[in-house]
Amino acid sequence: NFSEDLIESDQETLSEEERAAVDALPSGNALLIVRRGPNQGARFLLDSDVTSVGRHPNADIFLDDVTVSRRHAEFKRSGKTFSVSDLASLNGTQYEGDRVESAELVNGSEVQIGKYHLTFFASKKDI
């Protein structure tokens, strides 16, 4: 199964601490981990229906880099499914290497916002 292989390969690159954080996620929650770029290793919990991302200090996820728009993107939760939506940002939002307006996220997939490469991990209880 491709998605299981993807999950396993991403899990192998996680530190013990990151793996424990992913394993502990309650149902309906997800985690973004900065894999490359500024703040590498930073973790962001997705635990609400809408999580804003941007360079604005009031953003739920504050990414302090000029490649990130003040109001860049939103992560949305619908049941146990998550998606990312670009908010007409200057540099766009990429999902698995392609610029997108919005995309439904799958476990282990990569979202790029500015210089930040974030890997999405869903709760194991929802996979």
Give the role of each language-model region.
Residues 118-126:
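Short, Lys/Arg- and Gly-enriched loop/turn segments at beta-strand edges
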Residues 1-63, 126-127:
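Intrinsically disordered, low-complexity acidic Ser/Thr-rich regulatory segments
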Residues 34-36, 77, 122:
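Residue-level signal for short segments within beta-strands and strand-turn junctions
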Residues 45-119:
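Forkhead-associated
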Residues 39, 91, 99, 124-125:
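Residue-level detector of flexible, active-site-proximal loop/helix-junction positions
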